[in-house]
Amino acid sequence: MSFRPEYKEYFKQGATARIYNGAFEDAGFYDEVDIKEFEYSREEKTFYYPCPCGDRFEISLEDLRNGEVVARCPSCSLIVCTVYEAEDLEKYL
């Protein structure tokens, strides 16, 4: 399965961040991904998920514990919204 067509289509849409009542609404996320779908590195204490550009989205355990939801790809401008509950992180502490 290739993400390339979706990847190109994403940029054609011209996604932009919007703020509604102080919260992000469709902040240009490429996708929403459940934390259970991420791969976890105990050494780096970081979660990884494949990016369509060939690299990986990443978000640290510390960021998640601080309420962050944005996982970023270091090679391109895509971001995903990480979906999780506090109890999902307990096994990684």
Swiss-Prot record:
Its cofactor is Fe(2+). Disulfide bonds: none annotated. Residues 29-85 form the DPH-type MB domain. Pathway: Protein modification; peptidyl-diphthamide biosynthesis. GO terms for molecular function: ferrous iron binding; iron chaperone activity; oxidoreductase activity. It catalyses: [3Fe-4S](1+)-[protein] + Fe(2+)-[Dph3] = [3Fe-4S](0)-[protein] + Fe(3+)-[Dph3]; 2 [3Fe-4S](0)-[protein] + 2 Fe(2+)-[Dph3] + NADH = 2 [4Fe-4S](1+)-[protein] + 2 [Dph3] + NAD(+) + H(+). The DPH-type metal-binding (MB) domain can also bind zinc. However, iron is the physiological binding partner as zinc binding impairs the protein electron donor function. Belongs to the DPH3 family. This is Diphthamide biosynthesis protein 3.
